[in-house]
Design a protein with these regions (language model features):
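Interdomain signal-transducing alpha-helical coiled-coil linkers
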Residues: 14-17
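Short, conserved clusters of charged catalytic residues that mark active-site
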Residues: 26
């Protein structure tokens, strides 16, 4: 294979991952801050099979954000559902913490975005993690890996670097 082609493919993958990370994080912050400012419940729909985010707001028109098509996305909110509808409280918070993993075309995880809803802070917290080059985590074993690293954070920090 041509080295220039391989480097271009790696560059495009990194660009797509950064775009996806930014769009997902900004969409969640937008809905969270809007619900906090307006003191109203807001909704965000995450459709990972169609690779888009839909923001529904009673006072604003529905907004659709398209995610990069070449990547694969997985969330830990519920089991085996590619579509997920989240409601944000009047305080801009979510009821259940969860994560979104971003995979490359080879189905190897490259990025993790964690969303936390806390009663004390009453505001959504988002952490971004970049995969270190240690072990390979694939789409087929991500559910088990996520459960194990939630129980053992030392393993988690061997594989991930917080940004």
């Amino acid at each position: 294979m041509n080295i220039a082609f391989v480097k271009y493919r790696e560059f495009k993958e990194l660009r797509d991952i950064n775009e996806a990370k930014t769009k997902i994080t900004e969409a969640f912050y937008l809905v969270s801050t809007t619900s906090l400012k307006q003191k109203t419940k807001q909704e965000l729909q995450l459709d990972l099979s169609a690779k888009k985010i839909i923001i529904s707001n009673k006072s604003l028109k529905t907004q659709e954000i398209k995610l990069p098509k070449d990547l694969i996305y997985y969330h830990t909110y519920t089991s085996n559902l590619n579509s997920l509808k989240l409601s944000f409280t009047k305080n801009g918070n979510i009821s259940k913490s969860f994560s979104i993993y971003i995979f490359n075309r080879a189905k190897k995880v490259r990025y993790k975005i964690s969303f936390y809803g806390f009663d004390k802070s009453r505001f959504l917290k988002i952490n971004n993690y970049r995969k270190k080059k240690n072990s390979e985590i694939t789409y087929s074993n991500i559910d088990e890996y996520h459960k194990n690293t939630n129980e053992d954070r030392e393993i988690f920090y061997v594989d991930w670097r917080k940004e």
